[in-house]
Amino acid sequence: MLNKRGVPCRCESDGPPRQNNALSGTTFYVVGCNKAGWNKCRYINAISTCCKEG
């Protein structure tokens, strides 16, 4: 089962893509944002979700 996380991703609150934009989210694969204190901040695709702590 895939449960990898740790790849940075862009949340909706990060604004439009620009060079040197901070990526405040973390990609969760398969399991979604299932950790306490993590919230979905952007849909990526069927097997990964961008989540933000807090």
UniProtKB/Swiss-Prot annotation:
Keywords: Amidation, Disulfide bond, Nematocyst, Neurotoxin, Secreted, Signal, Toxin. The keyword Signal applies. GO terms for molecular function: toxin activity. GO terms for cellular component: extracellular region; nematocyst. It holds the Pfam family Toxin_4. The keyword Transport does not apply. It is found in: Secreted; Nematocyst. Disulfide bonds join 9-50, 11-41, 33-51. Residues 1-7 form the signal peptide. InterPro entries: Myo_ane_neurotoxin_sf. The modification Glutamic acid 1-amide is found at residue 53. Contains 3 disulfide bonds. In vivo, induces marked paralysis on shrimps (C.multidentata) at 10-20 seconds after injection and a weak toxicity when injected into insect larvae (M.domestica). Belongs to the sea anemone sodium channel inhibitory toxin family. Type I subfamily. This is Toxin AnmTx Cj 1c-1. It comes from Epiactis japonica.
